[in-house]
Regions:
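Generic cytosolic/nucleocytoplasmic N-terminal low-complexity/intrinsically disordered segments
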Residues: 1-2, 64
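Sec-dependent N-terminal signal peptides
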Residues: 3-13
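Extracellular, repeat-based ectodomains that mediate carbohydrate processing or recognition
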Residues: 14-157
């Protein structure tokens, strides 16, 4: 799947046709693309709401256009950085998962992974869950989603 996204981005960057992005507020950061099982794309990104609050938004590209962006979550506790940023993942059918990092303590690298799921194509989202329970405050991140052998959502970090 990652090869498909890379090839798609390469082909789009080498072609003349314009490929519009979803409507995002100025200053939006850290977009991430994921393919869907029916050949579409999902994109998630951070939008700054004010001086301390951010929202995690998403949009879907299908039938040659992007859907109106919707908010997955908003918080002032996000751990926002250039190296490890939120993702969105198409589990299958109308099921989607997303993740972000959230501060868990006062230390520079005290953060946890938060995961949400939607079973109605992003109309509503579950409460955020932390997929690890090792009891440490720091450096949980770089999560990757996958479908396991039963086609259920899997995660590794």
């Amino acid at each position: 799947m990652n090869k498909l996204i890379f090839i798609l981005l390469f082909l789009v960057s080498c072609s003349n046709p314009k490929f519009d992005l979803p409507k995002m507020k100025e200053g939006s950061q850290y977009p991430r693309l994921a393919s869907t099982q029916n050949g579409g794309l999902l994109m998630s990104w951070f939008e700054k709401i004010d001086s301390v609050n951010w929202s995690l938004n998403w949009s879907e590209f299908q039938n040659k256009k992007w859907s109106i962006s919707k908010t997955i979550s908003s918080s002032r506790a996000y751990f926002v950085n250039w190296a490890d940023f939120p993702s969105i993942y198409h589990i299958g059918g109308d099921s989607i998962a997303a993740h972000w990092l959230e501060r868990s303590g006062a230390g520079t690298y005290d953060y946890d992974i938060k995961v949400v799921t939607s079973y109605n194509r992003g109309e509503s989202w579950s409460s955020p869950q932390t997929p690890h329970n090792d009891g440490t405050l720091g450096e949980h991140g770089f999560l990757s989603f996958f479908n396991d052998m039963n086609n259920d959502l899997g995660m590794i970090w």
